[in-house]
């Protein structure tokens, strides 16, 4: 997330996490493997049974931060796997035994616990907005660089997001009619209320701050991004 790891190290981290920590039944990526010993002198982590809380549970907050870091470093497919596994587990009531939402952690059976005691939900939303849909602020401008997977588009090849930015309301629509992979497409055209936006290198669209300030506060402004 800090940009410290090299590309080679990131790939090694992904391979290791998949090999040692990923457990679909439990709900995703565990915090650690089973050390098979109790080490109370190392703090509360090793005071729990394996699969509970900080000792090897699928800890939602850390999993979402891992996903965020993967998206930031250009590994959207791997990041999507982290987010989607959490969502699938939470929405499977027979397994999670909880109302729809993101719990603090999932235990060995995939049961969600402590639905209120986590920052994962806010990090999940942050990642969906700023990394998956790719909507960010940059020196006052709005930039949009989507990294959506083909399965995240509807039948018409459309994915939508409603947000507020700089006090204005926006409805953002990403069109990928052929549902190509995120790194196989470029931004062909981008519009805000019918006005053409710049598509920088085909990777991101930009709505400048000076243009945002001209937009009315009451209206929901429509941004359309066409990928090809």
Where are these regions (language model features)?
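His/Glu-based metal-binding/catalytic segments typifying zinc-dependent metallopeptidases
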Residues: 1-8, 13
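Non-catalytic C-terminal accessory modules of carbohydrate-active enzymes
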Residues: 15, 19-25, 34-41, 47-56, ...
């Amino acid at each position: 997330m800090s940009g410290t790891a090299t590309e080679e190290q990131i790939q090694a981290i992904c391979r290791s996490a998949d090999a040692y920590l990923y457990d679909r039944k439990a709900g995703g990526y565990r915090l650690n493997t089973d050390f098979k010993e109790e080490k109370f002198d190392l703090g509360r982590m090793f005071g729990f049974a394996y699969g509970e809380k900080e000792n090897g549970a699928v800890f939602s907050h850390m999993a979402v931060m891992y996903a965020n870091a993967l998206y930031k470093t250009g590994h959207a497919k791997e990041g999507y796997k982290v987010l989607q596994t959490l969502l699938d587990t939470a929405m499977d009531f027979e397994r999670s035994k909880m109302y729809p939402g993101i719990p603090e952690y999932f235990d060995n059976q995939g049961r969600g616990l402590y639905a209120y005691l986590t920052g994962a939900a806010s990090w999940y939303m942050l990642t969906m907005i700023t990394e998956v849909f790719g909507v960010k602020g940059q020196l006052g401008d709005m930039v949009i660089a989507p990294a959506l997977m083909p399965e995240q588009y509807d039948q018409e090849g459309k994915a939508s997001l409603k947000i507020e930015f700089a006090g204005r309301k926006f409805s953002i629509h990403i069109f990928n009619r052929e549902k190509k992979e995120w790194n196989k497409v470029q931004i062909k055209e981008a519009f805000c209320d019918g006005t053409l936006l710049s598509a920088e290198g085909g990777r991101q669209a930009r709505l400048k701050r000076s243009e945002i300030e001209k937009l009315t506060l009451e209206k929901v402004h429509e941004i359309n991004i066409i990928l090809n």
